[in-house]
UniProtKB/Swiss-Prot annotation:
It comes from the Bacteria. Homotetramer. PROSITE patterns: XYLOSE_ISOMERASE. This is Xylose isomerase. It is an enzyme of class 5 (isomerase). The keyword Isomerase applies. Mg(2+) 2 binds at residues 267, 270, 306, 308. Its EC number is 5.3.1.5. Belongs to the xylose isomerase family. Disulfide bonds: none annotated. SUPFAM superfamilies: Xylose isomerase-like. InterPro entries: Xyl_isomerase-like_sf, Xylose_isom_bac, Xylose_isomerase.
Length: 434
């Protein structure tokens, strides 16, 4: 056991009246919600990169977090970091975690040496998992931090970088399968451009489509049963990223014939950067049958930055889970806390408290969403609003043509009168539950 979490006891559910800052007030994993355990609805995961690899730096300052596994440049400390991570998983009782390859192993001088480090730490993970319940929700490759990726991975103008990216994803998908991961995620932080002056957009998109097809082909070759997910984000670190939002990704997947093979991993902060609400992105993906998993966090609404803070807004979270539940809930996906401490939150207890708070907020949101579904008021309002389309009259309009509809309108047979959308009443209805 490491010393980092030595004085912190496992977090327990103590109910809403508890004053214990390291206790769950709302998250009871065994509580039944719509006939299913709360844990099985939410499927919480810890993000290895923010919780264990991030050192507290920002664009104006360096490291603020001092950990026993720093500096992160050798395998001995990588294993110390892994040991601490699994201790935190035990303390929180989370069923899943997620990683990038660069989070868990030090970068070496060659690809082969980095791969040896990677495989060694995967072996270490598997040994830890033998006596624990925490499993891998998804793995992914970091193809945005190292300078080789500065002009992209699959969209790079250098074909050798494309090949290096392919080799990297192969190793990460292999490791994800070894660990029993339920998904594999691709996020293209550098798959975009800084300026169109040196960018052949059509070629880059074709290369990105070909790359994703190669990933899908390899998934089937090795028999990986999990889902392949892509994660939208409009910008940061690139000026413009090709996977701008859910709708853009869906159009991309359809263009390259991948809509039956790939789903979406959606993040709250990325939705905000794209000018959307999180429930908008979830609803878009769900409407196309492409909702895979979510990264739960929040942004700073004043600065506009992608600050990756832990969630604390119950009404927002409730509406997210409302759309997830309406879509049937998660299958292979879950709720990954893609969130990090503030750079002044230095202690191990801060890391635990942040996750406890986030898990409680999600539990409250889930219960509110379930209550709204069971109440049925929103569904009734929706059904009434579109009832005209379910009538013979509405179906006849859909099956008609422009000339026929023109004639009916001209004859005065059709003279529409507006109806109230009742937005304020519906907002008040939601407020009864949150």
């Amino acid at each position: 056991m490491t010393e980092f979490f030595a004085d912190i006891a496992p977090v327990r559910y103590e109910g809403p009246d508890s004053a214990n800052p390291l206790a769950f007030r709302h998250y009871d994993p065994d509580e039944m919600v719509m006939g299913k355990r709360m844990e099985d609805h939410l499927r919480f995961a810890v993000a290895y990169w923010h919780s264990f690899a991030w050192e507290g730096g920002d664009p104006f300052g360096g490291q603020t977090l001092i950990r026993p596994w720093h500096p992160q440049d050798d395998m001995t400390r990588a294993k110390v970091k892994a040991d601490a991570a699994f201790e935190m998983f035990d303390i929180l009782g989370v069923p899943y975690f997620c990683w990038h390859d660069a989070d868990i192993r030090p970068e070496a001088a060659t690809f082969a040496e980095s791969l040896r480090n990677f495989e060694e730490i995967i072996d270490h993970f598997l040994a830890k998992m033998e006596s624990r319940r925490t499993r891998l929700l998804w793995g992914t490759a970091n193809m945005f931090s190292h300078r080789r990726w500065m002009a992209g991975a699959s969209t790079n103008p250098d074909p050798d970088v494309f090949a290096y990216a392919a080799a990297t994803v192969k190793t990460c998908l292999d490791a994800t399968q070894r660990m029993g991961g339920q998904n594999y995620v691709l996020w293209g932080g550098r798959e975009g451009y800084e300026t169109l002056l040196n960018t052949d957009m059509g070629r880059e998109l074709d290369h990105m489509g070909r790359f994703l097809s190669m990933v899908v082909d390899y998934k089937h070759k090795i028999g990986f049963k999990g889902a392949i997910l892509v994660e939208p984000k409009p910008q940061e670190p690139s000026k413009h990223q090709y996977d701008f939002d859910a709708a853009t990704c869906i159009g991309f997947l359809r263009k390259y014939g991948l809509e039956g093979e790939v789903k979406l991993n959606l993040e709250q902060g990325h939705a905000i950067l794209a000018g959307h609400s999180f429930e908008h992105e979830i609803a878009v993906a769900a409407s196309e049958g492409m909702l895979g998993s979510i990264d739960m966090n929040r942004n700073d609404y004043q600065s506009g930055w992608d600050t990756d803070q832990f969630p604390n807004n119950v009404p927002e979270v409730a509406l997210c889970y409302y759309h997830i539940l309406r879509a049937g809930g998660f299958t292979t996906g879950g709720t990954n806390f893609d969130a990090k401490l503030r750079r002044q939150s230095l202690d191990a207890t801060d890391l635990i408290a942040a996750h406890v708070g986030g898990m409680d907020i999600c539990a409250r949101g889930l219960k509110a969403a379930a209550a709204m579904i069971e109440d049925g008021g929103l569904e009734t309002a929706l059904r009434d609003r579109y009832a005209g389309w379910d009538s013979d009259h509405g179906q006849g309009i859909l099956e008609s043509d422009l000339d026929s509809l023109f004639a009916r309108v001209l004859a005065g047979e059709i003279d529409p009168q507006p109806h109230s959308g009742r937005q304020e009443m519906l907002e008040n209805h939601v407020n009864r539950f949150v």
